[in-house]
From Swiss-Prot:
E.C. code: 3.5.1.5
Sorted UniProt keywords: Cytoplasm, Hydrolase
Pfam families xrefs: Urease_gamma (PF00547)
GO-annotated cellular components: cytoplasm
Identification of the protein by name: Urease subunit gamma
Catalytic reaction list: urea + 2 H2O + H(+) = hydrogencarbonate + 2 NH4(+)
SUPFAM superfamilies cross-referenced by the UniProt entry: Urease, gamma-subunit
MF-aspect GO terms: nickel cation binding; urease activity
Listed PANTHER family: UREASE (PTHR33569:SF1)
Record flagged with keyword Ion transport: no
Organism listed in the record: Acaryochloris marina (strain MBIC 11017)
Amino acid sequence: MQLTPQEKDKLLVFTAALLAERRKNRGIKLNYPEAVAYITAGILEGAREGRTVAELMSFGTTLLSRADVMDGIPEMIPEVQVEATFPDGTKLVTVHHPIT
């Protein structure tokens, strides 16, 4: 299987997000890379489903709460930026203060 660097990055994010989702479902608080991967994967999947940039900017703030992550993690992630592929091309989605 031949994958581009971007495809490899997306698979790595998906794998980390899957692990984060499993831990979150078991009540384990997420660390920094898990939280970023979880939010990033949610945005990538939303773009694939056809949501707009504005919808995803709002959606990104609903994925995790302070209760889902370790202490100090919300302050470490002031924003998440994701290059997502939409039906009309690639766009940058920025989610400010993703963990509330």
